[in-house]
């Protein structure tokens, strides 16, 4: 899905890692939400409260899920899931454009 209809967008960005990662919350009429954001090239570690589906809409990165021993290459049009109460690491090789869906 390349666009969302009938949503509310939170104007203020959430800013992480000294401004190298930002996102904005998109809330749907049913109360579910996603975040749309970017990551500058670099290495980052994120924690999850809810299950997440991370879709990479542009860029190239490597990811390491909690408990995994091998990094996975992810690029434009690919996605990966992260369990609730877990973590994952990202090595952004290029500017990353992403959409994160929170699954409750």
From Swiss-Prot:
Keyword vocabulary terms for this entry: Glycosyltransferase, Transferase
Annotated GO CC locations: cytosol
UniProt EC number: 2.4.2.1, 2.4.2.2
Entry superkingdom: Bacteria
Pfam families, alphabetized: Ppnp (PF06865)
GO molecular function: guanosine phosphorylase activity; purine-nucleoside phosphorylase activity; thymidine phosphorylase activity; uridine phosphorylase activity
CDD domains linked: cupin_PpnP-like (cd20296)
Keyword Cytoplasm belongs to the record: no
UniProt catalytic activity: a purine D-ribonucleoside + phosphate = a purine nucleobase + alpha-D-ribose 1-phosphate; adenosine + phosphate = alpha-D-ribose 1-phosphate + adenine; cytidine + phosphate = cytosine + alpha-D-ribose 1-phosphate; guanosine + phosphate = alpha-D-ribose 1-phosphate + guanine
InterPro entries: Ppnp, RmlC-like_jellyroll, RmlC_Cupin_sf
Protein family according to the UniProt entry: Belongs to the nucleoside phosphorylase PpnP family.
Main function: Catalyzes the phosphorolysis of diverse nucleosides, yielding D-ribose 1-phosphate and the respective free bases. Can use uridine, adenosine, guanosine, cytidine, thymidine, inosine and xanthosine as substrates. Also catalyzes the reverse reactions.
Protein name, per record: Pyrimidine/purine nucleoside phosphorylase
Species in which this protein is naturally found: Colwellia psychrerythraea (strain 34H / ATCC BAA-681)
């Amino acid at each position: 899905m390349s666009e969302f209809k009938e949503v509310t967008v939170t104007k203020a960005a959430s800013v992480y890692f000294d401004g190298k990662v930002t996102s904005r919350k998109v809330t749907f009429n049913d109360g579910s939400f996603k975040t749309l954001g970017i990551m500058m090239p670099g290495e980052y570690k994120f924690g999850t409260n809810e299950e997440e589906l991370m879709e990479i809409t542009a860029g190239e990165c490597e990811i390491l899920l909690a408990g995994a021993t091998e990094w996975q290459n992810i690029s434009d049009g690919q996605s990966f899931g992260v369990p609730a109460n877990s973590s994952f690491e990202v090595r952004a090789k290029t500017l990353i454009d992403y959409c994160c869906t929170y699954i409750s």
